[in-house]
């Protein structure tokens, strides 16, 4: 089922999400299926449960190709419960981000370039991976939703925040 995606200004996006406590349940599997369907419908590269009003530490991400990020390399399809992120260096990298909860806007956001992330898959099996570049950016962006943070709060220079159609007139106007 496709869910409505909450938009910036909705107080539910500012909450700290609760940990997933029960794995491998029909409810969790149905939620994950709904999240993937919602993400695909919105042409997203990731989605956090709080974005559809579900107060759980659950994120999904991954794509082969995405019109919203045409130059981005593929990111493996991942389901991550109760994620933890560890920067593997102090190196930060600025990159343009958008968000399904902040439609039509883009901002230049600093993120750690190289991270390790861990958590659990839907069956409760531990996952641990390293990521860099755009993959690392997507993980950090989605996990921010679990602590009630949206990317505009990370922007250092607000002259690098605006409407996608103005900042990137060459992009498909339906991409955000």
UniProtKB/Swiss-Prot annotation:
Gene3D superfamilies: Peptide deformylase. Its cofactor is Fe(2+). Fe cation binds at residues 99, 141, 145. One of its GO terms (molecular function) is peptide deformylase activity. Binds 1 Fe(2+) ion. The active site is at 142. One of its GO terms (biological process) is translation. Keywords: Hydrolase, Iron, Metal-binding, Protein biosynthesis. SUPFAM superfamilies: Peptide deformylase. Its EC number is 3.5.1.88. It catalyses: N-terminal N-formyl-L-methionyl-[peptide] + H2O = N-terminal L-methionyl-[peptide] + formate. Removes the formyl group from the N-terminal Met of newly synthesized proteins. Requires at least a dipeptide for an efficient rate of reaction. N-terminal L-methionine is a prerequisite for activity but the enzyme has broad specificity at other positions. Belongs to the polypeptide deformylase family. This is Peptide deformylase 1. It comes from Bordetella pertussis (strain Tohama I / ATCC BAA-589 / NCTC 13251). The lineage of its organism: Bacteria, Pseudomonadati, Pseudomonadota, Betaproteobacteria, Burkholderiales. The gene is def1.
